[in-house]
Amino acid sequence: MTDVLRFGPELALFIAAAVVITVDALIPIAGKSAYDARRPIAVFLALAGVGASFAMSAILIAADEKGTVASGMIEVDDFSLFFSFLFAGVAGMIVLGSVDYLARNRFHAEYLGLVLASAAAMMTMAAAADLIMIFVALETQAIAFYVLVGFLKDGRSSEAALKYLLLGATSTALTLYGMAYLFGLSGQTSLDGIAQYVSNAGDENRSALVLAAVFLTAGLGFKMAVVPFQMWVPDVYEGAPTPITAYLSVASKAAGFAVVMRIFLVALGHGLITSDWANLFAAIAAISMTVGNVLALNQKNIKRMLGYSSIAQAGTFLIGLAAVAAKDPQLELGTSSVVFFLGAYAFTNLGAFMAIIAISAKIKSEQIEDFAGIYRRSPFLALGLAACLISLTGIPPTAGFVAKLLVFNAAVEANLVWLALIGVLNSVISAYYYLRVVLVMFTRDPSEATTFQPSPYLGFAMMISVVGLLAIGVYPNPLVDAADHAARIFG
């Protein structure tokens, strides 16, 4: 029974996914209005599942019910519980943001079921303490996303899904190669067992361990969307349903970083190759920030622009991980800064995409130029999107400013001043394309004068995001404390 309780947050979402699909199939409603009649029921059940997952996570924290599940393959600790809250919250926001989108594009309960199942899989990824469990959760999440990206079944969505599938299969192969090397060297699949081997390994094993780290970085780099493994990002972000683009940009990225932290800070964090992967992460961080920001400068499609922006943001996350290993003993500030950044980024990016969903539905375009004069037509959406873009830039008093400040401070503390300077310079570059959108919305004349407002679902989701990013910017202590507790497991 204890195992069931500890696995409760994930189990709640898996059960909710099955219930949503099953109940929808059993509802005896036919005819033209069937989709409109079934949609509210499925949305209610999906949100109930998210609420149950939140409640289970809160119970685990209140009861201090931590430990292992499935013979040690899953570790329930402050780190995994942080991501349980994060993924449940993101899934709930995506459900809210998808209501109107599904109404316009013909509702299917499988969509909501896949959103919930993928969130549960990502929770499992963050909690996995064994290579086998990591791989199973990784592939469960990936399969759900392959389907979700192509859910619209039009040419653009299908092309995006095919590219994502082909490149995802390649990343899976690379990840498996890295895991196979670690298993072959250590004879262990548990991260603690591998860590014990690595801490005692001699120089004769360095090359093989470095090769394993390179393969894992390449495979998981696809999930994190860092250079040079970012080829899929712009096309998939542009072609996928906009709520799924938001989901990919936040949840999939966070899950990738959670797995990287588990593997590299637990299994490979105390041994002879720590400096090797720290240098690798630092180089990838610098290149990702620069390439992502430079390519975003001339983008005309706002989803594509945010795709390149997400590559740059992933590079900023990696600064924190490079800082962890660049200092001995390990710098806890580096890990906690990454965890904090992921939480702050979720509020910021989700809010931006909620506004984009509402605006693009009205103007029938995702081109930045067509956002001209949106402030006069919908002040609420324009102000909300502006707040999110300002946060992505890293301007106070927003969550993005605090997050970048913590990451850059971690780099300086780890004697990676050059990397912090590159990060600051790239933040300045990013201000051009983020604030360009703000100027278009506030200073240009609109194409038509009719005003509009988002639906209650979208408006509520965006309001949560904007209030959250401003609250974190003004009073970051609660999220800082949560991130610190999550990071302590790697100490």
Language model features with spans:
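Alpha-helical transmembrane segments of multi-pass membrane proteins predominantly involved
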Residues: 1-491
